[in-house]
């Protein structure tokens, strides 16, 4: 099973990806983990990413795609993977689909976790309180959601047009949401 989890900040992508990894016995790939691993390994891509990040810039699509290609050659992805937080824009989605076609591992499903904006703000504010994070003010959260809507929401349309998208209600108990995702990807 090769799966992409999409959804705005606070929708529960990371939580559900961790649960699905255990349930399905497949690798969980997050861009943050990939970046940290490449930088720690001192690879050429890691050095490039570190230089970009140290300058306060976003890592380019080309560097991220190179890291993804490297990650997909590792043994733990042989049974499949869950991508969480990637692709973030249509250019990344196009490039990733090309890469997956080249290596003969097309996506099986793309799941969009749908959660109302006000609930997302409440969830993230609650998480910020628990973790003592000041950068998750309601205003900052709304800004992150706006960036998501501008850049990442078009990826949902991209996969809907290809017939690989399943929309799942991301509200409820964790077990209920997991069951909805499993039903959507097996249906």
Curated annotation (Swiss-Prot):
* Region listing for NMP, in residue ranges: 30-59
Pathways per UniProt: Purine metabolism; AMP biosynthesis via salvage pathway; AMP from ADP: step 1/1
**Cell compartments where the protein resides:** Cytoplasm
Q: Which GO terms describe its cellular component?
A: cytoplasm
Q: What are the protein's UniProt keywords?
A: ATP-binding, Cytoplasm, Kinase, Nucleotide biosynthesis, Nucleotide-binding, Transferase
Q: Where are the transmembrane segments?
A: none
Q: Identify the residues that bind AMP.
A: 31, 36, 57-59, 85-88, 92, 133, 144
What GO molecular function terms would the record report?
Answer: adenylate kinase activity; ATP binding
Against InterPro entries, the record matches this protein to: Adenyl_kin_sub (IPR006259), Adenylat/UMP-CMP_kin (IPR000850), Adenylat_kinase_CS (IPR033690), P-loop_NTPase (IPR027417)
Which Pfam families does the UniProt entry name for this protein?
ADK
Positions binding ATP in this chain are 10-15, 127, 172
Q: Where are the stretches annotated LID?
A: 126-136
Quaternary structure, per UniProt, is: Monomer.
**Family per similarity comment:** Belongs to the adenylate kinase family.
What is the recorded function of this protein according to its Swiss-Prot or TrEMBL entry?
A: Catalyzes the reversible transfer of the terminal phosphate group between ATP and AMP. Plays an important role in cellular energy homeostasis and in adenine nucleotide metabolism.
For this protein, the record's PANTHER family field holds: NUCLEOTIDE KINASE (PTHR23359)
Fill in the domain comment: Consists of three domains, a large central CORE domain and two small peripheral domains, NMPbind and LID, which undergo movements during catalysis. The LID domain closes over the site of phosphoryl transfer upon ATP binding. Assembling and dissambling the active center during each catalytic cycle provides an effective means to prevent ATP hydrolysis.
Q: What is this protein called?
A: Adenylate kinase
Task: Give the organism the record lists.
Answer: Stenotrophomonas maltophilia (strain R551-3)
Q: Which gene encodes it?
A: adk
């Amino acid at each position: 099973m090769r799966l992409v989890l999409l959804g705005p900040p606070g929708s529960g992508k990371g939580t559900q990806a961790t649960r699905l990894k255990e349930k399905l016995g497949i690798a969980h790939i997050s861009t943050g983990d990939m970046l940290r691993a490449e930088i720690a390994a001192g690879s050429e891509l890691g050095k490039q990413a570190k230089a970009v990040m140290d300058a306060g810039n976003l890592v380019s699509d080309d560097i991220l795609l190179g890291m993804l290609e490297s990650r997909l050659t590792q043994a733990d992805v042989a049974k499949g993977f869950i991508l969480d937080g990637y692709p973030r824009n249509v250019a990344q989605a196009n490039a990733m689909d090309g890469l997956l076609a080249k290596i003969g591992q097309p996506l099986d499903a793309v799941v969009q976790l749908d959660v109302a904006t006000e609930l997302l703000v409440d969830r993230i504010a609650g998480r910020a309180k628990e973790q003592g994070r000041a950068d998750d003010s309601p205003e900052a959260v709304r800004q992150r959601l706006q960036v998501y809507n501008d850049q990442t929401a078009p990826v949902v349309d991209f996969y809907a047009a290809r017939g690989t998208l399943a929309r799942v209600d991301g509200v409820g108990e964790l077990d209920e949401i997991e069951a909805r995702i499993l039903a959507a990807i097996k249906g």
